């Protein structure tokens, strides 16, 4: 999945789609001053290369709570193995493997503190997890 074939136009397309994954190809083409067919081919190439993994939405419900959970793992169990188990837990939105004091960063979503705690407890119960540090997200800015 090398990025050797990525040029400025591809980066601009990615930037536009990151802001709004539903942007019509015609609008992207107009902004880049190319044909819609050229945009379609470039996006298909980005998907084929694994650069665009999926088209999704980010949402925030009024009564929903989100938290960042930083996870420390033991070296005896590979971090990807732990990360995959965490990703399967209900309430887990996204899992990142990281460097530093914590090996994994998890974004958790729930309807209340009890559901957030339940998800964190489930993360802690995974073999190889030796510690967590959690922070509630107050506001999100895009």
Swiss-Prot record:
InterPro entries documented for this protein: ArsR-like_HTH, AsnC-type_HTH_dom, Dimeric_a/b-barrel, HTH-Lysine_Regulator, HTH-Siroheme_Decarb, Tscrpt_reg_AsnC-like, Tscrpt_reg_AsnC/Lrp_C, WH-like_DNA-bd_sf
Residue ranges of domain HTH asnC-type in the record: 6-69
State the compartments where it is located: Cytoplasm
Q: Which UniProt keywords apply?
A: Activator, Cytoplasm, DNA-binding, Transcription, Transcription regulation
Task: Kindly list the biological process annotations in GO that this record carries.
Answer: lysine biosynthetic process via aminoadipic acid
Q: What induces it?
A: Constitutively expressed.
Any single Pfam family the record assigns to this protein: HTH_24
Pathway assigned to this chain's UniProt record: Amino-acid biosynthesis; L-lysine biosynthesis via AAA pathway [regulation]
Question: A GO molecular-function term, please?
Answer: sequence-specific DNA binding
Annotated Gene Ontology cellular components are: cytoplasm
Superkingdom assignment:
Archaea
Ranges of the DNA-binding region feature: 25-44
Which SUPFAM superfamilies does this chain map to? Answer: Dimeric alpha+beta barrel, Winged helix' DNA-binding domain
Q: Which PANTHER family match?
A: HTH-TYPE TRANSCRIPTIONAL REGULATOR LYSM (PTHR43413:SF4), TRANSCRIPTIONAL REGULATOR, ASNC FAMILY (PTHR43413)
- Free-text function comment from the UniProt entry: In the absence or at low concentrations of lysine, activates the biosynthesis of this amino acid via the alpha-aminoadipate (AAA) pathway.
Q: What is the protein's quaternary organization?
A: Homotetramer.
Q: What protein am I looking at?
A: HTH-type transcriptional regulator LysM
